[in-house]
């Protein structure tokens, strides 16, 4: 196991500490904080060069910042389902979850293809004894600044996420609608 892999193991305890933190802060703020921490880690990865200590610090921050993002993304889908119901539409949790899974797979595939194309265009040659500087720079960019730019897009998008502040009222209204429906249709209560 490499030194950078050990950094990922260090992140595991964060997953156990994280649930109480969710109760104190909004999902939006936690995801945005995670994005900032991840971006700092990615920037450190770019400037680290071959400095293993800096690479480990960058990886630690990158992985720590990813914890709120990965743990809260599914909860955003639930919020969207509640919002849909509140607006009189279908909840569509299954559809929203499927679209999320599909987009993740397509995004991962396109990202891998993009990385391969970019490294090829930069002059990467697996059989070369010495890698050209252009290929090394592209590898560093693909490992740091390009993901950082995408995280900036996530940060901006999360700035527009306004559903959460209305969620207590949305949940209350939805519960009242369900209770009223069950009062009118008691035969559907356990179905």
Predicted features and spans:
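Membrane-embedded alpha-helical bundles of multi-pass transporters/translocases
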Residues: 1-191
